[in-house]
A protein has these predicted regions:
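Alpha-helical scaffold domains
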Residues: 1-231
Length: 231
C-alpha cells in the first residue's frame, strides 16, 4: 500500500465507533464484518472534503481495490466532489466494479452529473446492460435520481423494467424506482401496475414501497392496495 493510502487508513481507524460498526455491519450481509471499521457517514464526508484535490487523494483514488468498507465510501465521496464531468465519469466507471454492497452503491452521485443529463444517458445504458449487480443498480439509481422530473421520458420506465435478474439488490432497486415513479410520474408509471407489466415480486414490492411513502396521495395508496397480486 502506498504511504499516502496508509495514512488515510490510519485516519479512518482514528474515527472508529465500535457500537456503530456492530450496528452497521448487520445491515450489510454482503460485506465481511472484519472489513468494516465503523466510521459514520458525516465524518467520512468531512474527511473527503479535507482531502479533495490533494495529491494524497489522487494516490488514494488509484489504490483500488481497497481493503475496508469505509475506504470504499471515502473513495465514493471523493468522486462526488470532482467538478469535471469527464473525470467524474471516468472515476465512477473505474470504481463501480469494486462495489460489493448496496450502501456504497447508493451513497454517492457526482454533483456534476446533474449538469450533463443528456450525456449521462449513454453510460447509464451501458451500466444497465453490464450484468454486474451493483453497476446495474447504480444505473437504475441514476435514472431515479435525475430522470423522474423535468428530464423524464416514458421509455426510461422500460429501461428499468427490461432488466431481468434474480439478484435481490437489483430487483429491490427496480421496485424502489417504480415506487418513486408513481410519486413523480403517476400517469406514466401507474399503467405498469394496473396492466401487470412487471414481474410479480417487483410489482408487489413497488406497491409496498409506494404505500409506505409519504409522497403518494391517500387515494393512490388505496388504488395500489387493490392491485396487489398473488399470481
Amino acid at each position: 500500500m502506498e504511504p499516502e493510502a496508509e495514512i488515510i487508513r490510519t485516519q479512518l481507524f482514528a474515527l472508529r465507533d465500535e457500537a456503530y460498526r456492530i450496528f452497521h455491519s448487520a445491515l450489510m450481509p454482503t460485506v465481511p464484518p472484519e472489513t468494516v471499521i465503523g466510521v459514520r457517514v458525516p465524518a467520512l464526508r468531512r474527511l473527503a472534503k479535507q482531502l479533495a484535490g490533494t495529491a494524497q487523494a489522487e494516490v488514494f483514488l488509484q489504490a483500488l481495490p481497497h481493503g475496508y468498507y469505509e475506504e470504499n465510501n471515502l473513495h465514493a465521496f471523493l468522486i462526488e466532489l470532482i467538478r469535471d464531468y469527464d473525470r467524474a465519469l471516468a472515476e465512477t466507471e473505474a470504481f463501480l466494479p469494486y462495489i460489493n454492497n448496496w450502501a456504497t452503491c447508493d451513497c454517492f452521485c457526482p454533483k456534476v452529473f446533474a449538469k450533463h443529463k443528456k450525456e449521462l444517458l449513454v453510460p447509464i445504458r451501458r451500466w444497465l446492460d453490464s450484468g454486474e449487480v451493483y453497476t446495474v443498480r447504480y444505473g437504475m439509481e441514476m435514472l431515479m435520481r435525475y430522470y423522474l422530473d423535468d428530464a423524464f421520458r416514458p421509455e426510461y420506465l422500460e429501461w428499468v423494467a427490461d432488466v431481468r435478474s434474480t439478484e435481490y439488490y437489483i430487483n429491490m432497486m427496480r421496485a424502489w424506482y417504480f415506487a418513486t415513479a408513481l410519486a413523480k410520474q403517476p400517469d406514466a408509471a401507474l399503467p405498469w401496475l394496473t396492466e401487470k407489466r412487471l414481474d410479480l415480486w417487483t410489482h408487489n414490492k413497488a406497491i409496498q414501497k409506494a404505500v409506505e411513502s409519504r409522497r403518494i396521495p391517500l387515494g393512490m395508496k388505496q388504488l395500489l392496495r387493490g392491485l396487489r397480486s398473488r399470481s
